Amino acid sequence: MQIFVKTLTGKTITLEVESSDTIDNVKAKIQDKEGIPPDQQRLIFAGKQLEDGRTLADYNIQKESTLHLVLRLRGGTMIKVKTLTGKEIEIDIEPTDTIDRIKERVEEKEGIPPVQQRLIYAGKQLADDKTAKDYNIEGGSVLHLVLALRGGQ
């Protein structure tokens, strides 16, 4: 059967499941589709947080039900991204997050597509495929966001 998982950004993920699947199984399927580790996922249905060992049937989750996915950050690091207008955006990251992932988080909060973002830290423009750790970005670090318009490099 099909169920839907709605994320905080409003994105809806469609999953193929059985009612005998455990919540663990569902989280693994979400990881396959979205790359979010199960230990960072909290699934909510009818206002209740779902426990890993229970099955969809235990919660009376039927075909075309919608679950809500909330992310829990374990040991997350809070950084700030400062825009040219002086606005500061707080973002939770993991040291292993790529710069591209950080740009996606900026997009979630500000609606600016990653392709238009240039992130600067310690005077350097950050490469998308590098991680926060590669640049020694840690809690309290402030990145500067510069906008690149119309495909400029």
UniProtKB/Swiss-Prot annotation:
Residues covered by the Ubiquitin-like domain: 1-76, 77-152
Residues passing through the membrane, by range: none
GO cellular component: cytoplasm; nucleus
SMART domains: UBQ (SM00213)
Covalent link location (Glycyl lysine isopeptide (Lys-Gly) (interchain with G-Cter in ubiquitin)): 48, 63
An annotated Gene Ontology molecular function: mRNA binding
Propeptide: 153
Cross-link (Glycyl lysine isopeptide (Gly-Lys) (interchain with K-? in acceptor proteins)): 76, 152
UniProt entry keywords in alphabetical sequence: Cytoplasm, Isopeptide bond, Nucleus, Repeat, Ubl conjugation, Ubl conjugation pathway
Function comment: Ubiquitin exists either covalently attached to another protein, or free (unanchored). When covalently bound, it is conjugated to target proteins via an isopeptide bond either as a monomer (monoubiquitin), a polymer linked via different Lys residues of the ubiquitin (polyubiquitin chains) or a linear polymer linked via the initiator Met of the ubiquitin (linear polyubiquitin chains).
General remark: Ubiquitin is generally synthesized as a polyubiquitin precursor with tandem head to tail repeats. Often, there is one to three additional amino acids after the last repeat, removed in the mature protein. Alternatively, ubiquitin extension protein is synthesized as a single copy of ubiquitin fused to a ribosomal protein (either L40 or S27A) or to an ubiquitin-related protein (either RUB1 or RUB2). Following translation, extension protein is cleaved from ubiquitin.
PANTHER family (UniProt xref): UBIQUITIN (PTHR10666)
Protein name listed in UniProt: Ubiquitin-NEDD8-like protein RUB2
Source organism phylogeny: Eukaryota, Viridiplantae, Streptophyta, Embryophyta, Tracheophyta
Gene giving rise to this polypeptide: RUB2
